[in-house]
């Protein structure tokens, strides 16, 4: 059963009437531009064809009722006229509550709603299931009440909800690509200005995501350490963020920095350049150059930012051995486990799947991957 049909059926069963609107917001994968977002840099994600779907309708009072189909049909209910606080034991509810609370702070002119939510964005894989949920809830309220909020505002609203209400530190990339994604395109995002440029993905190229199924330990503490090291490097150069440090400025005096801090800065500064070059390569259909840039990105994450782990490196090597210079592959996401992303001709998807299934468990003491074949998809809207 499709997510739309599932949410409609559950809505009618639990609320006793039919929904008036169905909204979707996608997950995402970042093709290149890792740990550049909080350095005011550039990223190149695309929305994927895994999404959160919400069946919804207005209410004629000030109550929000919400059902999570994927959490055994759990229900939450709260009033728009009372302070919105965290749910005592349903963590999923806090994403909904946070989005609604921050929408109120932006524009209080909306009433109650009934919502039924379901999604197929893999959780815990670094594919932004939480951003997909936040954008979907915001889009649902915007559509029901014709709120004067564009995609950027809905993305910022979701980020604020996650940072301030849920309590998870995140950049703007995940929400922005979920809100603004375009079919068959990646989106070059300037994380300082929030300006975007659509970049076409060649039609014969598949976006493949492979989850290493390595449990991501240390990710929060190491993430915070990397941020602090980047901020230290920016202070050394007297700039707001590493975005403002060019390679010409950095390389002649990198030896004056603490060696570890210099490595972290070298990754960010070179990754920004790679991301801009990758947007041009992808738009031109130059998969050989795109593959080279993705390979350099992975090496930089491994050696300078030090956020890959051996099973991830093995996975990248296995995929690279099959696709050669006909595509690209690298780790994607925060690091210390999670997923790799690969761009490859459709004809190579099954050979890659077979090679990974054969080699990955042998090289990693029995780990088994999860394989997703995706298409660059459109951002949030009705479905």
Curated annotation (Swiss-Prot):
One Pfam family, short name: GHMP_kinases_C
GO biological process: galactose metabolic process
Positions of Mg(2+) binding: 130, 162
Binding site for ATP: 124-130
Record site: Transition state stabilizer: 28
SUPFAM superfamilies with a match to the protein in the record: GHMP Kinase, C-terminal domain, Ribosomal protein S5 domain 2-like
Swiss-Prot/TrEMBL catalytic activity: alpha-D-galactose + ATP = alpha-D-galactose 1-phosphate + ADP + H(+)
Gene Ontology MF term list: ATP binding; galactokinase activity; magnesium ion binding
Database matches in PROSITE patterns: GALACTOKINASE, GHMP_KINASES_ATP
Top-level taxon of origin: Bacteria
Assigned EC number: 2.7.1.6
Alphabetized InterPro entries for the sequence: Galactokinase (IPR000705), Galactokinase_bac (IPR022963), Galactokinase_CS (IPR019741), GalKase_N (IPR019539), GHMP_kinase_C_dom (IPR013750), GHMP_kinase_C_sf (IPR036554), GHMP_kinase_N_dom (IPR006204), GHMP_knse_ATP-bd_CS (IPR006203)
GO cellular component, one term: cytosol
Active site: 174
Entry's localization field: Cytoplasm
Cleavable signal peptide: none
Keyword entries, A-Z: ATP-binding, Carbohydrate metabolism, Cytoplasm, Galactose metabolism, Kinase, Magnesium, Metal-binding, Nucleotide-binding, Transferase
Function per UniProt: Catalyzes the transfer of the gamma-phosphate of ATP to D-galactose to form alpha-D-galactose-1-phosphate (Gal-1-P).
Annotated HAMAP family: Galactokinase
Identification of the protein by name: Galactokinase
Species of the source: Serratia proteamaculans (strain 568)
Upper classification of the organism: Bacteria, Pseudomonadati, Pseudomonadota, Gammaproteobacteria, Enterobacterales
